[in-house]
A protein has these predicted regions:
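P-loop/Walker A phosphate-binding loop and immediately adjacent motor/lid segment at beta-alpha junctions
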Residues: 217
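Acidic-and-aromatic substrate-binding clefts and catalytic sites of carbohydrate-active enzymes
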Residues: 80-82, 198-207
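Short catalytic-loop micro-motif centered on adjacent basic/acidic residues
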Residues: 103, 192-198
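Residue-level recognition of beta-strand->loop/alpha-helix junctions
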Residues: 57-60, 196
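Substrate-binding/active-site clefts of carbohydrate-active enzymes
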Residues: 2-54, 61-188, 209-214
Length: 217
Protein backbone atom coordinates (compact mmCIF):
# COMPACT_ATOMS: atom_id res chain seq x y z
CA UNK A 1 0.00 0.00 0.00
CA UNK A 2 1.05 3.61 -0.44
CA UNK A 3 2.22 5.13 2.84
CA UNK A 4 1.76 8.82 3.53
CA UNK A 5 4.57 10.51 5.47
CA UNK A 6 3.79 11.76 8.97
CA UNK A 7 5.61 14.79 10.43
CA UNK A 8 9.38 14.22 10.73
CA UNK A 9 9.20 10.72 9.25
CA UNK A 10 10.49 9.66 5.85
CA UNK A 11 9.36 6.91 3.49
CA UNK A 12 12.08 5.54 1.22
CA UNK A 13 11.28 3.92 -2.10
CA UNK A 14 14.45 1.83 -2.15
CA UNK A 15 17.12 0.59 0.25
CA UNK A 16 19.93 2.66 -1.26
CA UNK A 17 18.67 6.11 -0.32
CA UNK A 18 20.71 7.60 2.56
CA UNK A 19 18.95 8.38 5.87
CA UNK A 20 17.52 11.87 6.03
CA UNK A 21 18.82 12.78 9.49
CA UNK A 22 22.33 11.49 10.17
CA UNK A 23 24.56 9.87 10.81
CA UNK A 24 26.22 13.07 11.98
CA UNK A 25 27.74 14.48 15.17
CA UNK A 26 24.38 13.92 16.89
CA UNK A 27 24.11 10.28 15.87
CA UNK A 28 21.39 8.68 13.77
CA UNK A 29 17.68 9.42 14.12
CA UNK A 30 15.49 6.36 13.58
CA UNK A 31 12.84 7.98 11.41
CA UNK A 32 13.55 6.42 8.01
CA UNK A 33 11.01 3.81 6.90
CA UNK A 34 11.26 1.25 4.09
CA UNK A 35 7.81 -0.34 4.16
CA UNK A 36 6.52 -3.60 5.57
CA UNK A 37 3.22 -3.89 7.45
CA UNK A 38 0.78 -6.22 9.18
CA UNK A 39 -1.01 -6.96 5.92
CA UNK A 40 2.27 -8.19 4.48
CA UNK A 41 2.68 -10.60 7.39
CA UNK A 42 -0.87 -11.84 6.93
CA UNK A 43 -0.19 -12.51 3.26
CA UNK A 44 2.70 -14.81 4.25
CA UNK A 45 0.71 -16.89 6.77
CA UNK A 46 0.54 -19.97 4.56
CA UNK A 47 4.29 -19.80 3.96
CA UNK A 48 4.96 -19.40 7.68
CA UNK A 49 2.74 -22.40 8.35
CA UNK A 50 4.77 -24.44 5.87
CA UNK A 51 7.83 -23.65 7.99
CA UNK A 52 6.01 -25.00 11.07
CA UNK A 53 5.85 -21.55 12.68
CA UNK A 54 3.46 -21.60 15.64
CA UNK A 55 4.01 -18.16 17.17
CA UNK A 56 4.33 -14.75 15.55
CA UNK A 57 6.09 -12.31 17.86
CA UNK A 58 5.74 -8.67 16.84
CA UNK A 59 8.07 -5.97 18.10
CA UNK A 60 6.16 -2.79 19.06
CA UNK A 61 3.48 -1.81 16.55
CA UNK A 62 1.79 1.11 18.32
CA UNK A 63 2.07 4.60 16.93
CA UNK A 64 5.53 6.00 17.58
CA UNK A 65 7.95 8.48 16.08
CA UNK A 66 10.81 6.02 15.54
CA UNK A 67 11.25 2.93 13.39
CA UNK A 68 11.81 0.68 16.42
CA UNK A 69 8.65 1.94 18.14
CA UNK A 70 9.92 1.47 21.68
CA UNK A 71 8.92 5.12 22.19
CA UNK A 72 5.13 4.81 22.22
CA UNK A 73 3.19 7.87 21.13
CA UNK A 74 -0.28 6.30 21.41
CA UNK A 75 -0.90 2.83 22.83
CA UNK A 76 -4.45 2.82 21.49
CA UNK A 77 -3.52 3.02 17.82
CA UNK A 78 -1.49 0.75 15.56
CA UNK A 79 1.14 2.86 13.82
CA UNK A 80 -0.26 3.92 10.44
CA UNK A 81 2.94 2.72 8.79
CA UNK A 82 2.27 -0.77 10.18
CA UNK A 83 -1.44 -0.83 9.48
CA UNK A 84 -4.60 -0.34 11.52
CA UNK A 85 -6.27 -1.81 14.58
CA UNK A 86 -8.58 -3.68 12.22
CA UNK A 87 -5.52 -4.95 10.37
CA UNK A 88 -4.11 -6.35 13.61
CA UNK A 89 -7.38 -8.17 14.26
CA UNK A 90 -7.34 -9.56 10.73
CA UNK A 91 -3.78 -10.83 11.20
CA UNK A 92 -4.67 -12.47 14.52
CA UNK A 93 -7.73 -14.12 12.96
CA UNK A 94 -5.63 -15.45 10.07
CA UNK A 95 -2.98 -16.72 12.46
CA UNK A 96 -5.55 -18.54 14.57
CA UNK A 97 -7.10 -20.18 11.53
CA UNK A 98 -3.67 -21.58 10.75
CA UNK A 99 -2.82 -22.80 14.23
CA UNK A 100 -0.61 -19.86 15.22
CA UNK A 101 -0.64 -17.39 18.08
CA UNK A 102 0.35 -13.72 18.08
CA UNK A 103 2.44 -12.07 20.80
CA UNK A 104 2.89 -8.31 21.09
CA UNK A 105 5.79 -6.44 22.65
CA UNK A 106 4.51 -4.52 25.67
CA UNK A 107 6.60 -1.43 26.42
CA UNK A 108 5.28 -0.13 29.73
CA UNK A 109 8.42 1.18 31.43
CA UNK A 110 8.52 4.37 29.38
CA UNK A 111 6.81 6.22 26.53
CA UNK A 112 8.22 8.54 23.90
CA UNK A 113 8.65 12.21 24.64
CA UNK A 114 6.90 12.88 21.32
CA UNK A 115 3.66 11.27 22.44
CA UNK A 116 0.14 12.29 23.31
CA UNK A 117 1.04 11.63 26.94
CA UNK A 118 4.27 13.66 27.29
CA UNK A 119 3.90 15.86 24.19
CA UNK A 120 7.19 17.73 24.50
CA UNK A 121 6.95 19.22 21.00
CA UNK A 122 3.21 19.91 20.92
CA UNK A 123 2.70 17.39 18.12
CA UNK A 124 -0.57 16.17 19.61
CA UNK A 125 -3.79 17.97 20.50
CA UNK A 126 -3.45 16.87 24.10
CA UNK A 127 -2.13 18.65 27.16
CA UNK A 128 0.99 16.60 27.80
CA UNK A 129 2.83 16.00 31.05
CA UNK A 130 5.80 18.00 29.74
CA UNK A 131 3.54 20.98 29.13
CA UNK A 132 1.64 21.24 32.39
CA UNK A 133 1.20 19.76 35.85
CA UNK A 134 -2.52 19.96 35.03
CA UNK A 135 -2.13 17.37 32.29
CA UNK A 136 -4.26 14.24 32.80
CA UNK A 137 -1.05 12.33 32.02
CA UNK A 138 1.22 14.15 34.47
CA UNK A 139 1.04 11.41 37.08
CA UNK A 140 1.90 8.76 34.51
CA UNK A 141 5.56 9.69 34.89
CA UNK A 142 8.32 9.27 37.46
CA UNK A 143 9.83 12.43 38.87
CA UNK A 144 13.17 12.85 40.61
CA UNK A 145 15.21 15.61 42.22
CA UNK A 146 17.69 16.95 39.68
CA UNK A 147 20.05 19.77 40.65
CA UNK A 148 17.74 20.94 43.40
CA UNK A 149 14.51 20.86 41.42
CA UNK A 150 11.83 18.35 40.55
CA UNK A 151 12.32 16.81 37.12
CA UNK A 152 11.15 13.86 35.05
CA UNK A 153 13.12 10.64 35.11
CA UNK A 154 14.33 9.31 31.75
CA UNK A 155 15.20 5.72 30.90
CA UNK A 156 18.99 5.40 31.16
CA UNK A 157 19.18 9.18 30.76
CA UNK A 158 17.68 9.14 27.25
CA UNK A 159 15.68 12.36 27.00
CA UNK A 160 13.31 10.91 24.41
CA UNK A 161 12.15 8.14 26.79
CA UNK A 162 10.47 9.54 29.92
CA UNK A 163 9.95 6.80 32.50
CA UNK A 164 6.50 5.82 33.70
CA UNK A 165 5.63 5.36 37.36
CA UNK A 166 4.57 1.77 37.93
CA UNK A 167 3.04 2.77 41.27
CA UNK A 168 0.88 5.55 39.81
CA UNK A 169 -2.84 4.70 40.11
CA UNK A 170 -3.52 6.68 36.92
CA UNK A 171 -0.88 4.84 34.91
CA UNK A 172 -1.85 1.45 36.29
CA UNK A 173 -5.51 2.00 35.50
CA UNK A 174 -4.72 3.16 31.96
CA UNK A 175 -2.64 0.07 31.18
CA UNK A 176 -3.96 -2.59 33.55
CA UNK A 177 -7.52 -1.56 34.38
CA UNK A 178 -10.67 -3.01 32.90
CA UNK A 179 -11.04 -1.55 29.42
CA UNK A 180 -7.40 -0.44 29.57
CA UNK A 181 -4.65 -0.93 27.03
CA UNK A 182 -4.06 -4.62 27.71
CA UNK A 183 -7.79 -5.34 27.45
CA UNK A 184 -7.94 -3.39 24.19
CA UNK A 185 -5.06 -5.36 22.67
CA UNK A 186 -6.54 -8.72 23.65
CA UNK A 187 -9.90 -7.64 22.23
CA UNK A 188 -8.14 -7.40 18.87
CA UNK A 189 -7.13 -11.04 19.14
CA UNK A 190 -3.58 -11.19 20.50
CA UNK A 191 -2.60 -14.19 22.60
CA UNK A 192 0.16 -12.90 24.85
CA UNK A 193 2.72 -10.25 25.71
CA UNK A 194 6.48 -9.99 25.79
CA UNK A 195 7.55 -7.36 28.33
CA UNK A 196 10.27 -4.90 27.43
CA UNK A 197 12.81 -4.28 30.25
CA UNK A 198 10.72 -6.45 32.56
CA UNK A 199 13.49 -6.28 35.17
CA UNK A 200 12.81 -2.56 35.55
CA UNK A 201 9.06 -2.91 36.09
CA UNK A 202 7.81 -3.12 39.68
CA UNK A 203 6.70 -6.51 40.96
CA UNK A 204 3.22 -5.18 41.60
CA UNK A 205 2.95 -3.83 38.05
CA UNK A 206 3.98 -7.20 36.61
CA UNK A 207 1.40 -8.88 38.85
CA UNK A 208 -1.16 -6.42 37.48
CA UNK A 209 -0.20 -7.42 33.94
CA UNK A 210 -0.59 -11.07 34.91
CA UNK A 211 -4.08 -10.42 36.25
CA UNK A 212 -5.07 -8.45 33.15
CA UNK A 213 -3.86 -11.23 30.85
CA UNK A 214 -5.72 -13.89 32.85
CA UNK A 215 -8.84 -11.76 32.66
CA UNK A 216 -8.64 -12.00 28.89
CA UNK A 217 -7.41 -15.57 28.36
Amino acid sequence: KKMEPMPNRTIHQNWYEPPVLGPDENGLWNIDFHGGDLKGIEETIKYLKSLCVTIIYLSPIVRSQSTHRYDAADYEEVDPYAGTNEGLKSLCDAAHRNGMKVILDGVFNHTGNDSKYFNEYGTFDTLGAYQSTESPYYNFYKRIWNQGKRDFSFWWGMKNLPECDGNSPEWRNYILGEGGIIDQWFALGIDGLRLDVADELTDSFIEGINQAVKRNK
